[in-house]
Amino acid sequence: MMHDDPNEAGLPPHDDAIPDEAAEGADAVNPLHHRRIRSFVTRAGRVSTGQRRAMDELGPRFVVPYAPELPDWNAVFGRSAPRILEIGFGMGASTAEIAANRPGDDFLGVEVHEPGVGALLKLIGEQDLSNIRIIQHDAVEVLEHMLAPESLDGVHIFFPDPWHKARHHKRRLIQPPLVAHLVSRLKPGAYIHCATDWQNYAEQMLEVLGAEPTLENTAADYAPRPDYRPVTKFERRGLRLGHGVWDLVFRKRAA
């Protein structure tokens, strides 16, 4: 789940409120990691009437139920097109804007936060978007079971939970085992684009992505924000206050 603007990305993280024992329990054993890394933290949130209506009316078409098997994604989207995975789309405003501006690409958004799913479905209906599909499930399991090797043209991970306390850094999403698994799902030449407003997390992302031998950085270190990534209201406000935002864009080396 994106962590930043409540209007853009659901509720912000509150790892001050997560006891160590509870956080430990959230990290069940997984083949990807010695300690389970989830792509989300479950948070309470109210689904609005409009979001619920969108879920009821548009969910059957645009929400893909999780199943531990490979779907026929061309059939799911109704065409064969470049496919971009987004992990944690928050309230979906950026996802919808990117999809609207890139109609030739298909976008698979993975998010567990129900109000966020409803909000993106509402935007899909309002903007008549056909190139988005949603899975409401843990992205790690989606990667493991629903995406074939070398099937993705890109991955977007924008403003993931920073887990800012040092003792919680091990719960951050961008870690070597997950990155290796992501890379296995990328076609040669495909990209991973991450963004964060936490400098410490940006430094970790740069180190982890840079250490993956099958990836190459498209910049000397941090990349200029690509034109396709919208600037959120929260981000714009932070920039006015002098806060930093760091984008990283890496590509998978050709075989």
Swiss-Prot record:
SUPFAM superfamilies in alphabetical order: S-adenosyl-L-methionine-dependent methyltransferases
Cross-referenced InterPro entries: SAM-dependent_MTases_sf (IPR029063), tRNA_(Gua-N-7)_MeTrfase_Trmb (IPR003358), tRNA_methyltr_TrmB_bact (IPR055361)
Keywords: Methyltransferase, S-adenosyl-L-methionine, Transferase, tRNA processing
Pathway: tRNA modification; N(7)-methylguanine-tRNA biosynthesis
The keyword S-adenosyl-L-methionine belongs to this UniProt entry's keyword annotation: yes
Entry EC no(s): 2.1.1.33
Catalytic activity, as annotated: guanosine(46) in tRNA + S-adenosyl-L-methionine = N(7)-methylguanosine(46) in tRNA + S-adenosyl-L-homocysteine
GO MF entries: tRNA (guanine(46)-N7)-methyltransferase activity
Region of interest called Disordered, as start-end residue ranges on this chain: 1-21
Positions of substrate binding: K165, D197, T232, K233, F234, E235
PROSITE patterns in the record: SAM_MT_TRMB
Gene3D superfamilies, per database record: Vaccinia Virus protein VP39 (3.40.50.150)
A GO CC annotation given for this chain: tRNA methyltransferase complex
Keyword Hydrolase on entry: no
Residues at the catalytic site: D161
Chain ranges passing through the membrane: none
Function according to Swiss-Prot or TrEMBL: Catalyzes the formation of N(7)-methylguanine at position 46 (m7G46) in tRNA.
Family of this protein: Belongs to the class I-like SAM-binding methyltransferase superfamily. TrmB family.
Designated name of the protein: tRNA (guanine-N(7)-)-methyltransferase
Species of provenance: Burkholderia lata (strain ATCC 17760 / DSM 23089 / LMG 22485 / NCIMB 9086 / R18194 / 383)
Gene: trmB
